[in-house]
UniProtKB/Swiss-Prot annotation:
Species in which this protein is naturally found: Bacillus thuringiensis (strain Al Hakam)
UniProt name for this protein: 1-(5-phosphoribosyl)-5-[(5-phosphoribosylamino)methylideneamino] imidazole-4-carboxamide isomerase
Source taxonomy: Bacteria, Bacillati, Bacillota, Bacilli, Bacillales
Gene: hisA
Cell compartment(s), UniProt: Cytoplasm
Amino-acid biosynthesis in keyword set: yes
GO molecular function, one term: 1-(5-phosphoribosyl)-5-[(5-phosphoribosylamino)methylideneamino]imidazole-4-carboxamide isomerase activity
Length: 239
C-alpha cells in the first residue's frame, strides 16, 4: 500500500480544514516546503498536495509554492486543486509535478478529461469528493446530483486508472475512513483507489490495506501525531 502524506495549501501556508469548511482552518506549518522536507526525511515515498485556493478559484494559485516543493524533495508529488485546462496540466508537469488530480473538470468537462487521459495516461488521477454520497465540486462548495459511484463508472469507461476518493464528512475529523462507501466503490469499478478522509490510526490503515486499497492519504493524523509516519510506512511495508 502507498502512503501519501498530505499538504493542503491556502494562502501559501500548510493548513488543515475540518469537513472541508474553509472557515474551520488550522495552520499546520507556515512553510509548506519545510513540511515537505520533513515528510521526506521521515521516509515518505510520495506526497499529496492540494491547492485549496485553486480549487475555489478554478486556477492554480499556489504554483510557485508547488514548484519550490518539487525542487526541494526527490520524491514524486501529486497535485490537485483548480486544474481545469490542458495548459494548467502542462504547467504543473513543467515545474516537476509527477501526477495531476482532476476533480471538478472530471464532472463538468469530459472533453478536457478525455484529452488529458489520452495525452498523459496514468499521470492523470481523478479526485471524487462525496458529500452524503453525491459528488461535490469547486472546493467542495457545490454538491451535484450525481452519485460518486456513477461518476467512478464514467471515469473507468474513459480510461482513468486511479481515483482518489474522499468522504467530505470524514475529512479532518480523525473519525476513521468511510469503509462502507469504499467497499461499494471497490465492487463497482476495477480502478486503483486511494482513500482519503478520516484516517486516524495505524488500525485504520491496516483495515484499508486488508481491503487491498491501493493507497491512503494521511493528513491531520500525521500533524497531530495520532499516526507516526515512520511506523505506518514500516507496517505497510510488512503487510
Amino acid at each position: 500500500m502507498e502512503i501519501f502524506p498530505a499538504i493542503d495549501l491556502k494562502e501559501g501556508r500548510c493548513v488543515r480544514l475540518y469537513q472541508g469548511e474553509f472557515s474551520k482552518e488550522t495552520v499546520m506549518n507556515e512553510d509548506p516546503v519545510a513540511q515537505a522536507i520533513i515528510f521526506e526525511k521521515f521516509g515518505a515515498k510520495r506526497l499529496h498536495i492540494v491547492d485549496l485556493d485553486g480549487a475555489v478559484a478554478g486556477e492554480s494559485l499556489n504554483l510557485s509554492v508547488i514548484e519550490r516543493i518539487c525542487k526541494a524533495v526527490r520524491i514524486p508529488v501529486q497535485v490537485g486543486g483548480g486544474i481545469r485546462s490542458l495548459v494548467a496540466v502542462e504547467k504543473l508537469f513543467s515545474v516537476g509535478v509527477d501526477k495531476v488530480i482532476l476533480g471538478t473538470a472530471a464532472l463538468y468537462d469530459k472533453t478536457f478529461l478525455e484529452e488529458a487521459v489520452l495525452l498523459y495516461k496514468e499521470k492523470i488521477i481523478v479526485g471524487i469528493d462525496a458529500k452524503n454520497g453525491f459528488v461535490a465540486t469547486r472546493g467542495w462548495l457545490d454538491v451535484s446530483e450525481i452519485s460518486y459511484i456513477d461518476l467512478a463508472k464514467q471515469m473507468e469507461n474513459i480510461g482513468v486508472q486511479t481515483i482518489v476518493f474522499t468522504d467530505i464528512s470524514k475529512d479532518g475529523t480523525l473519525a476513521g475512513p468511510n469503509i462502507g462507501q469504499l467497499e461499494l466503490l471497490q465492487k463497482s469499478v476495477a480502478i486503483r483507489l486511494i482513500a482519503s478522509g478520516g484516517v486516524a490510526s495505524i488500525q485504520d490503515v491496516k483495515k484499508l490495506n486488508d481491503m487491498n486499497i491501493y493507497g491512503v492519504i494521511i493528513g491531520k493524523a500525521l500533524y497531530e501525531k495520532t499516526i507516526d509516519l515512520e511506523e505506518v510506512l514500516e507496517v505497510t511495508k510488512l503487510c
